[in-house]
Structures are given as structure tokens and as C-alpha cells.
UniProtKB/Swiss-Prot annotation:
Entry's transmembrane regions: 240-264, 272-290, 306-327, 466-484
Keyword list, A-Z: Cell membrane, Disulfide bond, Glycoprotein, Ion channel, Ion transport, Ligand-gated ion channel, Membrane, Phosphoprotein, Receptor, Signal, Synapse, Transmembrane, Transmembrane helix, Transport
Name assigned to this protein: Neuronal acetylcholine receptor subunit alpha-6
InterPro entries named among the record's database cross-references: Neur_chan_lig-bd, Neur_chan_lig-bd_sf, Neur_channel, Neuro-gated_channel_TM_sf, Neuro_actylchol_rec, Neurotrans-gated_channel_TM, Neurotransmitter_ion_chnl_CS, Nicotinic_acetylcholine_rcpt
Glycosylation sites (chain numbering): N54, N171
Subcellular location, record wording: Synaptic cell membrane
Protein activity control: Activated by a myriad of ligands such as acetylcholine, cytisine and nicotine. CHRNA6 nAChR activity is inhibited by the antagonists alpha-conotoxin MII and PIA, a small disulfide-constrained peptides from cone snails.
Quaternary structure (record): Neuronal AChR is composed of two different types of subunits: alpha and non-alpha (beta). CHRNA6/alpha-6 subunit can be combined to CHRNB2/beta-2, CHRNA4/alpha-4 and CHRNB3/beta-3 to give rise to functional receptors. Heteropentamers containing CHRNB3 have an stoichiometry of (CHRNA6:CHRNB2)2:CHRNB3. Interacts with LYPD6.
Topological domain spans for side Extracellular: 26-239
One term of GO molecular function: acetylcholine-gated monoatomic cation-selective channel activity
Keyword Disulfide bond recorded: yes
Membrane protein topology class: Multi-pass membrane protein
Catalysed reactions, semicolon-separated: Ca(2+)(in) = Ca(2+)(out); K(+)(in) = K(+)(out); Na(+)(in) = Na(+)(out)
Amino acid sequence: MLTSKGQGFLHGGLCLWLCVFTPFFKGCVGCATEERLFHKLFSHYNQFIRPVENVSDPVTVHFEVAITQLANVDEVNQIMETNLWLRHIWNDYKLRWDPMEYDGIETLRIPADKIWKPDIVLYNNAVGDFQVEGKTKALLKYNGMITWTPPAIFKSSCPMDITFFPFDHQNCSLKFGSWTYDKAEIDLLIIGSKVDMNDFWENSEWEIIDASGYKHDIKYNCCEEIYTDITYSFYIRRLPMFYTINLIIPCLFISFLTVLVFYLPSDCGEKVTLCISVLLSLTVFLLVITETIPSTSLVVPLVGEYLLFTMIFVTLSIVVTVFVLNIHYRTPTTHTMPRWVKTVFLKLLPQVLLMRWPLDKTRGTGSDAVPRGLARRPAKGKLASHGEPRHLKECFHCHKSNELATSKRRLSHHPLQWVVENSEHSPEVEDVINSVQFIAENMKSHNETKEVEDDWKYVAMVVDRVFLWVFIIVCVFGTAGLFLQPLLGNTGKS
């Protein structure tokens, strides 16, 4: 006989033993029930037979695509790489059970290779397997509904138009359908009208504007049957910030540096140097960004057109600069200025361009600067032969000192012509007068030459100013015209 103390100890130990091991037994019972259910479902199951009670009935498959990542868009090879989840839902009448008979089990996770699956493939796959691998498990409910959502990475073919690169939009499609079953055997139904993007990771280069799905029934030339497919169209837009900062803005700066060439004075001697420096910088820049631009010969990208436009722009600036410098350094001994050049470039265009001479020039100042008496002075040896008064000779020997004083006063109060005509004509004076006349004639010739050279320089300045405005207009409107094309093109498509 056990004492009351011993009975209490035995009762407590039994309760503890039951509390510890009862969940284990329940788990074992549950595992046994699930194993019994699995054996019951798949003991006579054939995974190669369509799950229909009547052979003429189609299997209705509900299909949906969920995108998690837009991995890459290869413009050169025209491939779009995406990470997708493909949701398949269909009913298999051979996989039904009563939950009451199996301890309330309502769902099973079963390997996908144990059940019949629709052979849904990506029609426009470019690289890799066309069909999804069945390594994931499917969710089976007691009423026979199967939900299978395998992940897949697809590299699909996508015809791309990079005309407006880097402001381009692309329309890439994913076409899913059964490869062997026609519409009479598998009827595909789309879940929703758009791609599920709840778990989508944003891409740093592309933005998905729209991703709509459509169902198509197509009859191919190879077969008489009608095949059903579901096509998802991804309308994507390139994010142009990277290319704008690293490609377009530097080109804009180079273009406007080219415009400054025409504002640089020709006398500084650095116009051609600046043009060549800009051209070299553009060439080096093109070599650096060659790998960034899609290499294709089908179309010329917008940024390629702009780079070509900038290259032509800089080259023309060099040609025009050489032409302007040629005009700037012309002289009367090498070129004669035509009358139409004087009319157009010295009168008309300066008024149109709001240009004027820095100082008002009086034409003919060079000739007026030469004393008329010296210009009409007789040749040496003939100064006293005609028209010289006789009493002047006699008075010259008698009153030499008085005449010198009088000559000084006359030099200060009378024109030079009067002084020459009424002064002494000794050989020394004649030499001085001839030297002054030679200097005056040289000054006149120099002034006339300087005046013509100034006219040529002013013509070069006018030509520079004309091309300054022409290049500014071409640069602004050319740049705006190129980069407004994507906006106008997208507006026209919409």
C-alpha cells in the first residue's frame, strides 16, 4: 500500500510526463495523418494526364505575373532581363479530400514534379530555358485547387528603338502560353489586367510606366488548332539624369565655348588656338563616352546626332575663324576693297548689328594733315627762278640780321606756305624743306594705308559679329530642336 505522500508523488510525475510528451504524440499523429493523406492522393496518381473528368473539357488555368526586379536592358543585343514570379492556379479533381477524415488538414505543400502542371513557356525568350523549372513546391487545397508560383529569371527579346536615346521609351513584351496544349485542352485566363508590382524593386536606370496584360487567341500557320497566350507589355522609360550630367551638359558647354571664339578679338592671336583646343577637348570627350552610347548601326541615337552636330559646329568655327583672320590682316598692297564690301560691311550691316566706329572718322584726314604749301612746292633748283622779287635778293645781303628777326615773327604769325614763299632759299633750307616734304608725303601715305587697314579690320569685326549671332542662333535652336524631338514624338504617339 502506497502512502498518501507516495500517491501524490506518482500522480504529479504522471501529469508531468503527459504534459511533456503529449505534443510529441500529437505531432506524430499529425505526421502520420499527412503521410496517409499523401499516400492516398498520389498512390494511383498519373502526373502526365490532364486533370479533367471528361477528355473534351479544357483545364482552366488562371495565370498572373508579378515582377520583382527589372535587372537589365541591353540595347545592343535587344534583350530585357526580368525577375518574375509566375502564379498558376488550376483545379485537379483527383487531388481532393475531406478534411474531417484527416484531422482537419486543409492544405498540403507538395513538390511540383509530383503533379501535372501546365507547360507554360515564354515564347520570346532569348537566352536560357523557355520553360520554368519545377523545383519549387505547390500549394494544394482540399478542394483540388493548386497554386504554383515559381520564380524565374527571363531574358526576353525586345526590339528597341534608341532614336531618342537617352530620352527614349521602350515597349517590351513577354508572351506566355502553352507550348503543346491548344485552347481546347488548356484555357488560359489572366488574373487582373496588369502586372503585379507590389514587390517590385526600383531600377536605377529604367522606370516602368505601364505593364498591362492581354489575352490572345491565335491560329498559327503550322497548326489548325487555336492557341491561347497571355502577353504583358512593359512600357518603360529611361531615366536620363546620368546621361544628362555626364554627356549632354559637357557638350553644351563645349558648344558655347565655340561661340565665344567669335567674340575674341583678332589681334590677340588666340582665336585659332581656342578653336583647336575646343576641338581636341571634344574629341577626347567622344573617346571617353564611346562605350556609354549604344553601339548600333540601325539608327543614329539622339545623343549621337548632338555630338555630330557639335563636331560640325566646332569645325565650322575653325573655318570661319581662318576666314576672319584672313580679312583682318589684309593691306592695300595685297587686296583692294570692292565697293559692295564697303556698302555692305561698312554701312548696312553695322547699322543692323547696332555697331559703330569707336571714334568718328573724317575721311581724307591724311591728305589734310599735309601742308598745302609743301604739297605744291616746286622742285629743287626752281624755287627762285620764277616770281621771286629782285629787291628781296638785294635786301638779303644788306639787312641779314633784320630779316632773320622778321622771319621768326612771320613763322609764328603766318601760314607755312607764306613762310616758304618769302624766306631765304639757301641749300641748307632747301634740304630741310625737302626732308619735311618727304616726311609729310610718307605720313600721308601711312595715314591712307592705315585707314584702309582699319577698314579691313572693321570688316573682319563685322563678319565676326555676324557669325557670332549666327552661331548663337544655330546653337540654341539646334540644341532645342534636337532635344524637343522626344517630347514631340511622345506627344504624337499618345
